Each structure stands twice: as structure tokens, then as C-alpha cells.
Amino acid sequence: MLKPLGDRVVLKIEEKEQTVGGFVLAGSAQEKTKTAQVVATGQGVRTLNGDLVAPSVKTGDRVLVEAHAGLDVKDGDEKYIIVGEANILAIIEE
């Protein structure tokens, strides 16, 4: 299993028509974004005074992420992307 560092997040992209709260996203929005599930998160980032700021997302969250963000990686037969937390646009609440 992949364990990201810092503010990075491992995502599994959902390969289906994107919906947010039951609404199907318009074609142009689907081209600019992807829906994904958070598989793992890094520990967060340190502030200048050394405090640790934890990630805003947690394992299991469904998120909307920029379509071209991140690095494609493979772990066994599974495909994932690793993104910085700043590339996650929203948490999808069901």
C-alpha cells in the first residue's frame, strides 16, 4: 500500500459518470474534474513554528479533483493518482 508524505493524498479515480449530490455534472465540468475516493493521506504539513496541520480529507472521503492534477501510479494491479491536497476542489457529502 502507498503511504504519501506531507500534504499529498492517494486517490482512486471513479470511472463513471460524475454526479455531485445527485446532479450529473455538465460535460465541460467532467472534462475539468474527476471524482475520486481518498485511499490514503500524508501526515500533513508543518507551519513555520513547527505545528502540524493535518489534511482536510480523510481515508474514504469522496472528492472532486482537478482532471490533470497529480501523478499516475500503480500498486500491484490497482491504479491511483497522487495529488497535493491543494488540487482537491471539494469533499462530496452524500
From Swiss-Prot:
One of its GO terms (cellular component) is cytoplasm. Its main location: cytoplasm. SMART domains: Cpn10. Coiled coil: none annotated. It comes from the Bacteria. GO terms for molecular function: ATP binding; identical protein binding; metal ion binding; protein folding chaperone; protein-folding chaperone binding; unfolded protein binding. GO terms for biological process: chaperone cofactor-dependent protein refolding. The keyword tRNA processing does not apply. It is found in: Cytoplasm. Keywords: Chaperone, Cytoplasm. Belongs to the GroES chaperonin family. PANTHER family: 10 KDA HEAT SHOCK PROTEIN, CO-CHAPERONIN GROES. Together with the chaperonin GroEL, plays an essential role in assisting protein folding. The GroEL-GroES system forms a nano-cage that allows encapsulation of the non-native substrate proteins and provides a physical environment optimized to promote and accelerate protein folding. GroES binds to the apical surface of the GroEL ring, thereby capping the opening of the GroEL channel. Heptamer of 7 subunits arranged in a ring. Interacts with the chaperonin GroEL. This is Co-chaperonin GroES. It comes from Streptococcus pneumoniae serotype 4 (strain ATCC BAA-334 / TIGR4). The lineage of its organism: Bacteria, Bacillati, Bacillota, Bacilli, Lactobacillales. The gene is groES.
